[in-house]
Amino acid sequence: MSWIKDQVILLTGGGSGLGLALIERFIAEGAKVGVLELSAEKATALAHCFGNDICVIHGDVVSFEDNERAVAETVRCFGKLDCFVGNAGIWDHKISLLDASPEQIDKGFDELMGVNLKGYILGAKAALPALTASEGSMIFTLSNSSWFSGGGGVLYTASKHGAVGMIRQLAYELAPVIRVNGVAPCGMPSDLRGAASLSQQDRCITDNLSLESLSAILPLQFIPQPKDFTGPYVMLASRANNRTLTGVMITADAGLSIRGIRQTTAGVMSPTKKESSDDR
C-alpha cells in the first residue's frame, strides 16, 4: 500500500540524479508531481517521459516569480499541493579559500547561496499558501556537507550548513500547520554541476569524486545510487507515517556520519598537503 497515493508534490531540480529518482518514486507510489526545472532540454524530456502524471515548469529557483508560477501551475494541473521538495542545487568542486580568488569568492558566494539556500527559501515562500490550505509539508535536500567539512569547498559547505538553520527556523515558524524536514544524502553518481561563476558549469560531481574512494569510506561499503535515497522523502511526505516529525534532518549517508569524511587531521595548508600539491 502506498504511503503517498493521491498526494501532489512539487519538486525543484528534477531533470537528473536524485531529483529524477524522486520523481520516479513519487509517481510509482501514486502521487502526482510538479517540477521546476532550469534546463529546457531536461524539462521537455520529463514531460515526454511521465505524461499526465507530471506538470513541468521551466524556470529558475532563484526567481520568486518562477517558484510562484510553479506552484500555480501544479495546483492548476492537479488541484492542490501536499508537499514541497526543495532539491535543486549546485556544487563547488571543493574549491578552497586558499585557491579561490576574491572575485571567485564574491561571485561564487552569490551563486551557491542563491541556488542552494535562497532558492529553498523562495520555494518555501511560494508554496506557503497552498501548503497552509492542505496542512502539508516541506522537505529539503541537505548533504553530508551540512554536518562535516571536506565534502565540498567553503562556499558549498556554508550553503548546506545554512540550510540546516533554515529548516529548524521554518519548522518553528510554520508549526503546527506545516511540517518541515530535511534529508542529507552522501555523495552519489549524478549530474550535479558546479557553479558557472567558478567556470564549473560543465563539470559534474563525478568528475571530481571517485565513487570507488567514496565506497571505501562508507561503512556500508557500497556506492549508493540516487534511488537508494528516496525512501526517507516518501516517509516524511506521508501524513499517516509522519505525524510527529518536524525540524528533523535524516542523515542518509550509508554510515558516513559514524566515522567522518576524512581520516587525516591535516588541512589544505599542512606541509604534507603542500608537498603533495607541489609534486603535481
UniProtKB/Swiss-Prot annotation:
Gene3D superfamilies for the chain: NAD(P)-binding Rossmann-like Domain
EC top class, as a word: oxidoreductase
Catalyzed reactions per annotation: 3-(cis-5,6-dihydroxycyclohexa-1,3-dien-1-yl)propanoate + NAD(+) = 3-(2,3-dihydroxyphenyl)propanoate + NADH + H(+); (2E)-3-(cis-5,6-dihydroxycyclohexa-1,3-dien-1-yl)prop-2-enoate + NAD(+) = (2E)-3-(2,3-dihydroxyphenyl)prop-2-enoate + NADH + H(+)
InterPro entries referenced in this protein's UniProt entry, alphabetically: BphB-like_SDR (IPR047950), Dihydrodiol_DH_HcaB (IPR023643), NAD(P)-bd_dom_sf (IPR036291), Sc_DH/Rdtase_CS (IPR020904), SDR_fam (IPR002347)
Top-rank taxon: Bacteria
Pathway the protein contributes to: Aromatic compound metabolism; 3-phenylpropanoate degradation
Keywords: Aromatic hydrocarbons catabolism, NAD, Oxidoreductase
GO MF annotation, one: 2,3-dihydroxy-2,3-dihydro-phenylpropionate dehydrogenase activity
Positions annotated to bind substrate: S143
CDD domains from the UniProt entry: BphB-like_SDR_c
Enzyme Commission (EC) number: 1.3.1.87
PROSITE patterns: ADH_SHORT (PS00061)
GO biological process, alphabetically ordered: 3-phenylpropionate catabolic process
Keyword Repeat tagged: no
Listed Pfam families: adh_short
Keyword NAD among record annotations: yes
Catalytic center residues: Y156 (proton acceptor)
Sequence similarity: Belongs to the short-chain dehydrogenases/reductases (SDR) family.
Listed HAMAP family: HcaB
NCBIfam families xref list: 3PPDhyd_Dh_HcaB, PRK06200.1
Function: Converts 3-phenylpropionate-dihydrodiol (PP-dihydrodiol) and cinnamic acid-dihydrodiol (CI-dihydrodiol) into 3-(2,3-dihydroxylphenyl)propanoic acid (DHPP) and 2,3-dihydroxicinnamic acid (DHCI), respectively.
Protein name per its UniProtKB record: 3-phenylpropionate-dihydrodiol/cinnamic acid-dihydrodiol dehydrogenase
